[in-house]
Amino acid sequence: MSHVITCPSGLAGRIRGMKVREERILADRKLAKSGGQVDELLGACWQETLDPGPYDFGDKLIDWGAVLQGDRFYALLQVRALTYGPEYAFALGCQNDGCRARFEWELNLGDLPVRPLSEESRAAFVNGNRFETTLPDAGVRVWFRLFTGTDERRLPQLRRSAGERILSAMLGWRVLEVEGVGDKDKRRFLEDLSMRDADFLVDEFDRVDCGVDTAIEVECPECFTAQEVELPFDRGFFLPGKGRMARRRDRSSSSPS
């Protein structure tokens, strides 16, 4: 069964759910280490492009490395929902130090808010993926870019190599140019930013970007503490829900030996 989707940037196409043969993609450790699983899954399940949105691939297949991170994640959510249904259950631990209970939370993936790419952001992306803002404390202009699939694949290595300087490393990766600052001095400038400017810059990244809001509020069933968590996105995301797995176990146990 196929389904037509429109991604946050306007990219539209026909997708299908995962097939058994896609299991090899999920099980490929080398592919997982290189960050290529998402590209492989999307390439396998994207059947037809109906509207290229802000991208220009011509008659070629979609280069998922050039697609915005928000579009990629949205498409993955739709593939997962088409494969197993929109319900997604996952385990959590209560953040209340006096509780720490483990519990399961379930949500409908279709209920996650989606932020479309604005016309202004689309124009900036098409014209070189270059966005401009002015830092409130430093008072200088900064130019930055939105993350694509190629960046997404490099993120694990960046996090490993950044160590305790993850914020400055992430800023340095996204910031293209700082007014009056040479390329050799850009890293030092970013490390000397006030936290107010750093927070402002991260907010600007989000403001002009598109995608799915994955911050969700859950409530511990034991102590009723409300807490905000990020939607878990790991290998379990592409596996059947616990209800489906339980039904499989029930069928197996009731089968004649």
Each PLM stretch: what is its role?
Residues 1-257:
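Long C-terminal interaction/binding lobes of large macromolecular proteins
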